Amino acid sequence: MTRVDFSALDTAGLNLQAVFRLAALPGEVAAALDPEGRHRRLILIGHGGRTLWERVKAAGLATEHPIDEFTRARVAEWLAAQLPGVAHELVYPGDTPVGLQALGRLAGWHHESPFRVGVNADWGSWFAYRAVLLVDADLPESVPQAGASPCTTCPSQPCVTACPASALSDRDFSLQKCVAYRRQQDSRCRVTCVSRTSCPVRPEHRYDDAQIAHSYSRSLAMIEKFY
């Protein structure tokens, strides 16, 4: 059994890690990510809270995708230090389709929220998936994060009533209403999500306004391109 130290990733703000045995994942997941069966483990890497953005800003990356570039660099450094010479493949960020939320559910990180962003009791909705790494090493598997969805003990669900698009008013998310409202020039959700910022779970981990604007500007660009 090969043991590794994730502390360098923690310091970089990539403070969520889950190790899966590829052979134990649902067959369609393993087949899509590692069709030739060349690796033994999948490492899901994420971030929770504000530290990653602070590290990215300090790195001064003036690129279109600074978080992805920072993540690739830190993961490469970690691999060189912890698993030198081990065969590996970084499938995300990249062009390979990856079911990030499905992996998040298996890790115990992801519970569905009314506003369709994953939520958990430790970080609220203020976490994200940053890398999916395949390695040919016999790493110890992670124990899934325990705990039920915090939404089950939130009877008032202020995220529903806060949505200015009424996209959650029927207790089911309306992508059409959300997209139509975000496209409006005077929309309160062009570079944020009012429902998400109204969620009362772990507000101390909320991203700063610049990080929120960065993320939602990217999603708005996709909306304006494809809708």
Whereabouts are the PLM-identified features?
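Non-ligating segments of multi-cofactor redox enzymes
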Residues: 1-227
